[in-house]
From Swiss-Prot:
HEAT repeats lie at residues 96-134, 168-206. Interacts with microtubules. Belongs to the CLASP family. Residues 226-271, 510-793, 816-839 are annotated as: Disordered. Microtubule binding protein that promotes the stabilization of dynamic microtubules. Required for mitotic spindle formation. Residues 229-239, 580-594, 663-676, 696-708 have a biased composition (Low complexity). Pfam families: CLASP_N. SMART domains: TOG. Keywords: Cell cycle, Cell division, Cytoplasm, Cytoskeleton, Microtubule, Mitosis, Nucleus, Repeat. It comes from the Eukaryota. GO terms for biological process: astral microtubule depolymerization; cell division; mitotic spindle assembly. Residues 535-545 have a biased composition (Polar residues). This is Protein STU1.
Amino acid sequence: MADTKLTDQQVADLNTILRSDSPLDAKVQYVTIIKSGIKQHNVPESSVAQLFEGLRAATTSQHAALVNAGFTALNHLLTRLSRQDPKLLSKEAARTLPLVVDKLGDQKDKFRSLASHSLVTLFSVAPADVEKYVRNTAMVGKNPRAKETSMHWLLQMHNENGLPFRTYVPVLMELLEDADGMVRDAAKNTVIELFRSAPNAAKSDLKRQLKTFKVRPAIEQAIVKELIPTSSRPETPAAPAEPTPEPAPRKTFSASTSSAAERPITPGIDTKPEVLEPLYVNTNRELDDMIKEMAWFFEGKETEHNWLKRENSVHKLRRLIAGNVTDFSDTFLAGVKSILDGIIKVITSLRTSLCKEGCGLIQEIAYTFGPAMDPLIEQLMQCFVKLSAGTKKISSQLANVTVNTILSQVTYTPRLMQHIWFACQDKNVAPRTYATEWLKTILKKEGHHKHHLEHTGGVDIVEKCLKKGLADANPAVREKTRSTFWVFWGIWPAKADAIMADLDGTAQKLLNKDPSNPNSAKAAESVARPGLGLSKSTMGTSKPSSIREAMMAQRKANAAKNLPARPGSAMAQLSPEKITTTTSSASSKSSGARSRPETGGMSGAPMRPSRKRPEMAARPATAGPYSVRDMDPGSPESVRSKTPKPRETTPKRTVPRTRPGHASHASESSLASPSSVRTGQKSAASPRASPTKLKQSQSTMLSMSSPSRADEDFTMLVPSMANFRTSQRPAPPPQRAASVPPEAPEELSTLVTEIAPQNIPQAAAEPTSQPTLEPELEPQPEPEATPTPVVDPVAEAVDQTMDETVKPEEPVHIIPEPVIEPTPEPSASMQADQAPAASAPTLQVYEDPFTDEQTNSKPTFNLPVLEDKPVNADTASLPSVHAQSPVTQNIEAPDRAKQSLRLLESGIKRIKAKTLDVHGFRKLQSLLRDSKGIFADDKFEALLIGLFQYLEDPLSGTSPEKAQDIKAQILATIRLLLKKERDNFQPHVSRGLESLLETRSAYDIRAHIVSGVEVLADELVTIGDGSEIVVVLTRRLQNVDSSTTEGSRILSTGMHVLRTMLDKRPNFMPTGTELGQLAALAGRCLASADSGVRMDAVQLCVALHSRVGEQTFWDALKDVQDDPKSLITYYIVKRQREQAPTIAA
């Protein structure tokens, strides 16, 4: 029956069955048969009304099964009639629409979808009725699901059929403030999508509607931010932060010169560009209304009621400049001119914040519009020259910066020079000082076309300004003018020589000695490196130092004479005291003798009397004191190559940190004395010190934190947990520890140990970085006490540098600190026998990289705070890690390796499933950084391929910000693998570059992940096979369409990678086939419509020309048109000229 056409009798029987008491299953089955007939054949026209009536009755039934069958059949009937005879459908639309609109709010998604589809069908025959029901019934009803579905239908109809939505805007504004959060979100998304492609006038009207209906600010800002108008102009980069010319460097004074008599220099204003949230306008009328609205706030005098409105108005103008106001530049500049008097009131306000906003606005107008603001210059220059003469330092400096910005951006006129001349004659020092900088800005800007100055009388004014400045009563003005004079001399040397000839002998001498003098041979030698102190390592001259340095040298010599003889103990009886100076960057850091000797203790600090040391062989008298020992240990080449050089910073005076309360009860030797805690002071190297072998971890820390006098320019590192953790880690057997010097990064107890000679392997004889003064003697056996370390999982990432100094096969042991009690001292042989047994309570701590549960246990102490400290009496009872044999040390290594392998496999699985989040990647990086030898070839390849696939995935189900963060961690993990497994990485370079190209295509140049992609690509090309990279990339870029945004990004990045490979690999020479592929790629991209792709193609051609030579290059590019060839030739010549000075040097 289902395959036959419906008859009138069947339709009549449908109504009879639905009204009867027949079983539900029979009704559902009959409706289903009717539905099949509708789907297969046309409906008899005479029965259409009865069929609609029956199916509407089934749809409104109380039984879900019958409703399902009836509503689906009704949807098929609507579709059938829209094709068979739309007139029949239009007659039933009025009676069917209420039922369909009611189903828009059904609980089941299926029915809501069917209702939306039915509305689309009915809209084709009765559009007015459908819109009326949707707008006046569904959208304003009480059912939130109906509201959401109706908005989705509206968006669908607009996108597919171009439905005008203007009449829906008031209803959508009401829905933006609906009580239901889901409705508000749907309304917000609907408004954004509807207006995204709307004209600018409609977007401007939308902003007014949002204000009129008082939509909450968060929703309003989200909508406006999404509807940023499209601009034909590329986004303007941030204004440069150096409008002020660099002042001339100060004359080099000796270290003894005191500046106490001079006036303290007020810190300069912050020139860091302020980050402004862009504000966008859509039409000229909107911009004009906005400026007219704020004009009222600038009327009259500044009061408590209007100053904040003025500040907000100026800030809004700055936001407009950061937005798209350049698309309406005429309207904006006309508006600014109309309120210029008000802006000047803001600039001259006594409120600093208001003045700063005004100056910032003028600077940004100058940077953005340049000569277009010429009509405003006269009033502004008068205002700022007057403001620069004020007594308020911040306002004066702001005026100086703003005038410099204006002069560097606007068109030169003779009036500008007149303003500078007036400033040179001002009675205040500040304008006269600033005028020299303004004059220098004019000279540098107009020096290339000096006829502007010559034909308008500007040169005469410049000469008058220079003469007046060189004869000024203030020395600062004279000094600034000398620098400006030499800029003038570079343009008009004859006139400058005439000015110099009129000066007296002293003034001429000072002028010739000025650092800006290009004729001075010593100009470059006498300038100290900026940012460092006046020590001998930072000064450029080799002349004798000042009187103060001579006094310090004399004190050092006297202290060396007064040192007592070296005792037989393992330490010096006293340590030279650090002499601090009043200047943080003193030129000399010498040490003087302490006034009294101390006995006992292993540092220079005063100590309580300690117990008698156990009977053992005396330390050789030739050993130098710990406090002045050379702290540069010799390290294997492999360790040096993997440990990055610590960053050099300026020595600064730091506040002494509080001393941790009894961090270790085993020894007090490393606690620094109060006199030695001051940073930036170096102890003098003892002439009797012999080179010693330090702990690997401690020696690394000490060599960075306490350099010798020979390396005085290395300054103190910032204390970090990484250094502390390293100092607590057990050291390898071949090295002997020293006490922590006064400048250790953390003031925590660190034990001093000496290893028995029989435990030192032969491979430990590494040369130290300092010359050997005396032959190395065998150290005496001394037990070691290990304090409880503080485990900090957060410091794992920071601790990479220090971790690499530990032997790879040695696990980190954490030993609980026992309660110290006096015990009889055993012999050395007994200690050696007891060492393995004492290590029984050793606990290995592992970290799961993919769990968040990390616990840090703090050590507890049962001893009083103040007590006598037994230095070495009870060390035999403590376990000694280094007394273990190599076999004992590696017992637990397999277990840890297995656990690391399991964690790695778990990470690989999650990476393949693309479920590993940012935190998981950081844990994985920590595992890869700390584990050694966990990679098999298959594991490495699986992890790397999984990372590449994860990197390429668009992560459509994740928010864009989170997706960027995840991909940034993927890049960091790949770079870590590249660093640790460089050889294994080499076969996967080409695959990695393809993945990076795919990733780059999804992001704009402003995305932060782009820089990471480019850096990784630049590293990969240095290790891959050049020919393979050329073949793979040219094949990948061959069919990429440059007309799309993604294609342009891929082409630009690919050619950048190829150019980088040519630049970084001078030994790579492409073959004829490879050259042809590269030339074909470049030739195709030179004809691209995207300017960035064309530029990268030109750069690639320049690199190819530099590599293959003139004739071969042009033969390969013979099919390229003449215009691109001219451009390529220009850049080739430009590069050759840039390289010429380097080659000549």
